[in-house]
From Swiss-Prot:
Gene: aspS
Reactions that this protein is recorded to catalyse: tRNA(Asp) + L-aspartate + ATP = L-aspartyl-tRNA(Asp) + AMP + diphosphate
Role noted for this protein: Catalyzes the attachment of L-aspartate to tRNA(Asp) in a two-step reaction: L-aspartate is first activated by ATP to form Asp-AMP and then transferred to the acceptor end of tRNA(Asp).
Predominant subcellular localization, coarse grouping: cytoplasm
Protein EC: 6.1.1.12
Molecular functions per Gene Ontology: aspartate-tRNA ligase activity; ATP binding; nucleic acid binding
Similarity field: Belongs to the class-II aminoacyl-tRNA synthetase family. Type 1 subfamily.
Binding positions (ATP): 229-231, 238, 497, 549-552
GO BP: aspartyl-tRNA aminoacylation
Region of interest (Aspartate), residue spans: 207-210
Localisation: Cytoplasm
Gene Ontology CC terms, in alphabetical order: cytoplasm
Protein name: Aspartate--tRNA ligase
Length: 601
């Protein structure tokens, strides 16, 4: 390798940082040839490094025999360049490039490595299938989109650490090899070679350990942590993902919300230049479910669910009147301009809601020139139709969709329909951000399939002050489990839950009662959570916290379609890494060491 190359590794210039003030200076650059153009006697090479692109000009009359080396350059060759920075002629200025007013006139060139022709274009404006990008992730990093997202991710996490350090938080690493407590999603299990027939589990969250840290007196903890869940994947899920995990001692819910608002406001401004207004609005869980059909409502548009049960309870349309009579509800969502929705589309919506949300049907009315129109309007009095229209604020050209069933089915089905129709009729403004706290969650939810109570958040969530009397005895608690609310809170951005947490239970007595409600007996509780229950007997302080989904936040802030867009080496929706081809079989010897025998599938 030429001597001048090694001498300048430390003193290199960065392509994206060059500017006109350096005109006449000798510049040394390292990078990849992005584009090249041979114009007979002059070769133009767009040299790319992490910071940007600079045009390098090789002139035959200046280079002599060395010009033949420039002629060998092809796409993605690794180059070392030395030359003089010059301003471009006016007719050569490229306003689309950050360095479009300057160029480097080549003095010396070295090809450090050659490259095969890439399987896809590395130009940011060219469409490339996600499968190809995941298989050749190392090439995708050279594209502006992924590279910039990785840099933003670094800046985002750096800003978090910087802010929390100033707020007296201590970053502490919790174990990756954990005890399996399969209460939520499935655990990823790791067999122990030293302890045959025993298994570790990769952590779904550091929940118990961070509570232990509070018992230990650390008071303010945070961690940028990897979490693992073996679940079916969707657009916003990965088997491994990154959280900002936090826990506080001697703190109220109000103080936690305020602290988080300060953090979010600061990092959004520093990293993305987004100015937020704090405190963030708050909405109760009950309001979110009743008016939006979701505990993570997208509030950038209207189309609220409106309860019209009182209006239709005595109407002649038995689907509506019968639902109210049987203790259910009737709600309507008004779609502005939705009268253009075709009958075929309505049939498709009906089938979808029946399949995924158990909705028995989807009644509808159009708001025409004479008011509400439909095949069912003849079953309603004029006053009832007028009252429905007034309740939801419909006007000519709108479409009204109705749900009539159990309250839960109506809320979930119309909430899902609201989101689907918003993509067409209520598209939010570009770059609009709405962040809202959802508070006052139920502590438990009834599991119809297993006929039991489940924790809505997790078993360690503290009851609200209003619900504490329910915990005076197990008999009282069992009777009022459905009425108990929790000191729990979720932070929702544009219809996506980006964070959630709660005040924790610091009383062993209350914690044991919660376990009993959930059907976890004393022996099972001791086996799974014994070390936490024991720790609670050694002076556990009042404490609480939350976790942020860093991947989800960055997906929203960088305009990604999936969290795969902001993760360096993500898995597919089948949990596969197309680049490294994992998961993969292992050698029989490894299985024997672990005392594992594979079953035929």
């Amino acid at each position: 390798m030429k001597h001048w190359i090694q001498e300048n590794y430390k003193n290199r210039s960065w392509a994206g940082e060059l500017n006109e003030s350096q005109e006449g200076k000798q510049i040394v650059l390292f990078g990849w040839s992005f584009r090249f153009r041979d114009q007979g006697g002059v070769i133009f090479i767009d040299l790319r490094d992490r910071t940007g692109i600079i045009q390098v000009v090789a002139r035959k009359e200046l280079l002599g025999d060395s010009f033949t080396l420039a002629e060998k350059v092809r796409s993605e060759y690794v180059l070392a360049v030395r030359g003089t920075l010059k301003k471009r002629d006016l007719e050569s200025i490229n306003p689309r490039m950050q360095t479009g007013t300057i160029e480097v006139v080549l003095d010396q060139l070295e090809i450090l490595n050659v490259a095969k022709t890439p399987p896809f274009s590395l130009d940011e404006f060219d469409e490339v299938s996600e499968e190809l990008k995941l298989k050749y992730r190392y090439l995708d990093f050279r594209r502006e989109e992924l590279k910039n997202r990785m840099i933003k991710r670094h800046e985002f996490i750096f800003a978090i650490r910087n802010y929390l350090n100033k707020r007296k938080f201590v970053e502490i690493e919790t174990p990756i090899l954990n005890k399996s407590t399969p209460e939520g999603a499935r655990d990823f299990l790791v067999p122990s070679r030293l302890n045959p027939n025993q298994f570790y589990a990769l952590p779904q969250s550091p929940q118990i350990f961070k509570q232990i840290l509070m018992v230990g007196g650390m008071e303010r903890y945070f961690q940028i942590v990897k979490c693992f869940r073996d679940e079916d994947l969707r657009a916003d899920r990965q088997p491994e993902f990154t959280q900002l995990d936090m826990e506080f001692s001697f703190v109220s819910q109000e103080e936690i919300l305020s602290e988080i608002e300060g953090l979010v406001e600061t990092i959004y401004k520093e990293v993305f230049n987004i100015q937020l207004s704090i405190p963030f609005p708050r909405m109760t869980y009950n309001t979110a479910m009743e008016e939006y059909g979701s505990d993570k409502p997208d509030l950038r548009f209207g189309m609220k669910l409106v309860d019209v049960s009182e209006i239709v309870k005595d109407c002649d349309f038995n689907v509506f009147a019968g639902a109210v009579k049987n203790g259910g509800t009737v709600k309507v969502v008004c779609v502005p301009g939705g009268s253009i929705i075709s009958r075929k589309e309505i049939e498709d919506y009906t089938a979808w809601l029946n399949r995924d949300y158990k909705a028995k049907g989807l009644a509808y009315m159009k708001h025409g020139t004479e008011g509400l129109e439909s095949t069912i309007t003849k079953r309603f009095k004029k006053e009832e139709l007028e009252a429905i229209s007034k309740a939801c604020g419909s006007k000519e050209g709108d479409m009204l969709f109705f749900g009539a069933d159990e309250r839960e089915i109506v809320n979930h089905s119309l909430g899902a329909l609201r989101l689907k129709l918003s993509e067409r009729f209520e598209t939010p403004k570009e770059n609009e951000i709405n962040i809202t706290w959802i508070v006052d969650f139920p502590m438990f939810e009834w599991n119809k399939d297993h006929k039991r109570w489940d924790a809505l958040h997790h078993p360690f969530t503290s009851p609200s002050d209003e619900s504490i009397p329910f915990f005076e005895s197990m008999e009282t608690l069992q009777k009022n489990a459905g009425n108990a609310t929790a000191k729990a809170y979720d932070l929702v951005m544009n219809g996506v839950e980006i964070g959630g947490g709660s005040i924790r239970i610091h009383s062993k007595e209350i914690q044991n009662k919660v376990f009993q409600v959930l059907g976890i007996n004393e022996e099972e509780a001791k086996e799974k959570f014994g070390f936490l229950l024991e720790a609670l007997e050694f002076g556990a302080p009042p404490h609480g916290g939350l976790a942020f989904g860093i991947d989800r936040m960055l997906m929203l802030l960088t305009g990604g379609k999936s969290i795969r867009d902001v993760i360096a080496f993500p898995k597919t929706q089948k949990g596969l890494c197309l680049m490294s081809e994992c998961p993969s079989p292992v050698e029989e010897k490894q299985l024997q060491e672990l005392k594992i025998k594979l079953a035929k599938v």
